[in-house]
Amino acid sequence: MSWTPARRSVSLKIAFAIGVAFTTLDHAAFAQSCCAGTGAVTPGRLALHEFALVGVQAKTAVDLGSFDRGGHYVANPSGASELDLEQDFFAAIRIFKRGQLALLIPLVETRRTASGVADEFGGGLGDINASARYDFTLAGASQFVPGIAALAGFTFPSGRPADSPNLGPLATGATGIGAYQINVGLAVEQTFGPWLVNATVLYAQRTARTVGDAPNTVHERLAAQWTFLSSLAYTFPSEVALAVSGSYTIEGDALINGVDNVGTAHRLPTLTFSGVYPLSDSWRLQGAIYDNLQITPLGLNQPAGAGLLLTIVRSWT
């Protein structure tokens, strides 16, 4: 198949809109010390005409407050603040024409302040994610049948969990959740002229882990996590594209020593505005801003904030 400018535009639009949307999901979830990111896709989703890509993404986010166990939003107290930084290095390659494999390696840094405590900065390697995607049908190929894709991912606990030693008084050295995570998902998307509409559902399950030293050990298992995402994107004739995405992540109560730990469930909404600017046939810039919508009672047991992302991608056809 030869790739005309119109086909290439649709292809880039689909890859960009969903890739950037999931990037903000990953970051928002990673900021939760108790919860893992969705991890089902990377910010480097391949366009249909692309064979491989590599990229680097920089993230900056600030915590503005948190949702308590009753779902009420509370701003940070005086003297308390948090700045989260992350640099993601990722690559993706196409297999079987409609499939793709990807790898993401994150570096994570955190700066925290608290009243009566000196400022603290720490970080390191985060949890590495490998992912896969297979498109059974393609968006825009049929007027009646949308694009349908299966998503899968596996996250390795390469980061340091919050219970690790020598993390600092404010635990800024924590960079992971300390558990393996398996993700599966389903994406449905369709194009309508220059518009793209997407709906995705993701399911994540984490392995159990033992925390502490005998005889004071605690057996912990995080509950399953569900994420629901919808996106709307528009591509201009220049192939510049803009998108708006909304997501909602839900997680049940954790199990502690086999007993349901009531009051530990989580909820977090995220609203994202993103864009892509093609620099050439092989290079593109992607950017996004997101906010966790500090509205009672949308969240639960979660820090809430806002962030900025900037990504550069090099692809091959």
Regions found by a protein language model. Give the residues of each.
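Short loop/turn motifs that connect adjacent beta-strands in outer-membrane beta-barrel proteins
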Residues: 42-51, 98, 138-147, 194, ...
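Transmembrane beta-barrel strands of outer-membrane/channel proteins
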Residues: 52-62, 103-107, 148-156, 199-205, ...
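Residues on the lipid-exposed face of transmembrane beta-strands in outer-membrane beta-barrel proteins
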Residues: 56-58, 89-93, 103, 130-136, ...
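Outer membrane beta-barrel transmembrane domains
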Residues: 65-77, 209-212, 216-317
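Long, hydrophobic/aromatic-enriched structural stretches that serve as scaffold segments
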Residues: 79-131
